[in-house]
Design a protein with these regions (language model features):
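A contiguous loop/helix-start segment that scaffolds small-molecule binding in enzyme catalytic cores
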Residues: 1-70
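C-terminal substrate-binding/active-site "lid" region of AdoMet-derived donor-dependent transferases
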Residues: 184-245
Length: 251
């Protein structure tokens, strides 16, 4: 949402006697006296982040720095909350966040359970620096951040920097890669360990669910559909977020 990243300045009648500049609050209704001769200027906000003021659980999306070219590329708060609940985070152990992006899931898990060892993996250039900055904002420290394609890691069997996961989040990759991850890491996981897979493509659910069950995971499937309110002239309307399926497997 742009209002989380920019201030909106309404400039009216520029160069004329009635020139006026004012800051807009887009969470409220627009002023009724806006001149027809206007332009809106967006200025990027600079915020000071202090983890002292953050909630323990349910951190707002705007706290996380995201990719400059994809500012909305993160797991939204409403979905992230459910993923963290489904992970049943232990006090101690190892969690892998594959397709970590800006690190929102793994880092919030680490804030909830500081004694966990977090391993973040994402292939996108710049993801490591992004996760490091967000870890500073949240006041947590991942054990290891790998800016690499998980396929390359699994194909070369270069798993020496990693510890066996007790909790595994598999996001940000296609069905074939998800299946390969399950096949490769299943032998590393023990009774009680949990995998959570966010899915937006309904067609992939059946095969992933069957693969987990073949590996002796007990599965559960939830659909997360949320709406956010937007202010309009008449009051308010609800804007739907993209629906997300959460497939959970418990060993």
């Amino acid at each position: 949402n742009l209002i989380d990243f920019y201030d909106f300045w309404l400039c009216e009648e520029i160069g004329f006697d009635n020139e006026k500049i004012r800051k807009l609050n887009l969470k409220e209704s627009l002023p009724s006296d806006i001149s027809n001769l206007n332009i809106v200027v967006l200025t990027k906000t600079k915020k000071n982040y202090s983890n002292d003021n953050l909630p323990l659980f349910g951190i707002s999306d705007h706290i996380f720095k995201t990719f400059d070219d994809r500012p909305n590329l993160l797991t939204k708060r409403e979905v992230r909350i459910q993923i963290l609940a489904d992970l049943e985070l232990p006090k101690n152990g190892v969690i892998w966040d594959i397709g970590a992006g800006c690190g929102s899931i793994g880092l919030e898990a680490l804030k909830l359970r500081p004694n966990l060892d977090l391993f973040c993996i994402d292939k996108r250039f710049g993801s490591k620096a992004l996760i490091l900055e967000n870890s500073e904002r949240l006041g947590v420290k991942p054990k290891f951040i790998c800016e690499e394609d998980i396929n390359n890691i699994l194909n070369t069997k270069n798993l020496s920097p990693f510890e066996k996961p007790n909790r595994l989040v598999i996001g940000g990759c296609d069905k074939k890669t998800k299946l390969q991850i399950i096949n490769s890491l299943d032998q590393w996981m023990s009774i009680g360990d949990i995998i959570v897979i966010p899915i937006i493509d309904f067609q992939t659910i059946k095969e992933l669910k069957e693969e987990l069950e073949d590996k002796n995971f007990k599965t559960n499937l939830n659909l997360i559909q949320t709406y956010k309110s937007l202010s309009i002239a008449e009051g308010m309307r609800l804007e739907p977020n993209n629906p997300v399926f959460l497939l959970t497997g418990k060993k």
